[in-house]
Amino acid sequence: QFFYVFHMPAFFIISGYLYRPHDWKRTIVSMMTPVVVFSLFNLCFQILISFLKEGCYDSTDLFRRIMVPYIGGVADPNVDYIVLFMGAWFPIVLMLVRLVVGDIKAFSFVGRYKVAVFLVVMAFMVTLPLWADMNNDICQMKPFLMFPSLPFFLLGMMLHDVDTQMLHKWLKRLVPLFFIVYLFMAIWNGRVEILNLHFGHNYLFFFIGAVSGSAVLFWLCSHFKD
C-alpha cells in the first residue's frame, strides 16, 4: 500500500524531467522493440513447454487471448488470457505520452503549453468519476492510462524548467512536510494503482500523495548520493 502510492508516478515524473524530443518513429521502435522481442520469446517458450507436457498447444482464439492484456478492455472471466509481458502497460503508456508531448510535431503544443494542459488533464481526472463509469470499455483500455499518467510526466517537465539548486533547496526544506502528507495519504486514501484506475477517494488525493512520496524518494536518492 505504501509503495503503490508513488512507485509508478515517480517513474513518470523522472521520465518527464529527463524528456528530450525525438523522432516519433525512433520513440516507437525504442519503446516497443523490447516488448515485442520479450513477448515473442515468452510465447515460444510457453508453446514449447506445452508441447513437452501435453503434446499440443491450445491456440483457440489465440490473437484475442494475447492482445487483450496489451490493449486492455473489459476482460471476459471465461477466457484464459496469455500474459507475455508483465508490466507492458508502462512502456506502452510512456510511449504514448512521449508521442503527444512533442515527439509527434502535430501535438507539440502539449509540451509548449504544459501548464495549461496539466490543469486541463487534472480537472478531467478529478471530475471523471462524477460523470463516467470507470469500468466501461474505454476506461479499461490500456491507452486510456495515458490520462492519469500525463500529469506526472508534465510535472517532471515543469520541474526541469526550475533552477536545479533552487529545486534541491526547496526539496530539502519541505521534505518533512512531504513525508507527513505521504504517510497520511497512504493510510487515509487506501491502496492506489494507476493500472487498475484505483485512486482512492479521488484522483486529486492520489496525485498529492504520489507527488509527496516521490519527493521523499528523490530527496533520499540525492541524500545518499551526497
Predicted regions and their residues:
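Alpha-helical transmembrane segments and their immediate juxtamembrane cytosolic regions
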Residues: 1-226
